[in-house]
Amino acid sequence: MTIVAGPVEQPTPPGVARVDVKTASEMFEALDTALSAGSVDLLAMVAAVSDVHLENPLAHKSPKSSMLSDLGGLQWAQERDLLGALIERHGARVPSLGFAAQTLPKEGDRPAALRSLGEEKMRRKGADALFANEVGRPGVGFESETNEGVLLVRDEGDAVTSRTSPPSMAKDALAGWILDHLLTGGVIGY
């Protein structure tokens, strides 16, 4: 197993290779190299990189007196869609799992909204499976010990099935739940 990690403080589990990167471009290159090197059971893109980057970052800290005008003049560019680009390049031989952190309206059927948003994202990227979860709600997602959401799996006929996770699962238990469903759903096999 290889982890390609951005700047995080998480320890690397024993027996796992780790490649540290700082930018989305470095992450793409490291993932592309790992996927090109041989047999891969699953490409799991479990965390997002930034959606945009500065074209020409400031070379120095901006003084308070000119900060607003300096920041207003910065040019932004959209980051490459790493999952979509890797699937386009390696998809036929590499099963893929994406994650989609979504914000939802306060009212309505949350699992149905996650299914709809997740399925659109999964199809757009060409992923075999995608876990959609809500962010911005206390107790789940970022900066929480628990999470919950909807796992979408695409079969060979392009039909999508979904399963809603149990509520507020510990993240390591949720990872096991997802892997179990990927195995039984035929996304990865042993």
Feature map (PLM): residue ranges:
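A cross-family phosphate/adenosyl-ligand binding-site feature
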Residues: 1-190
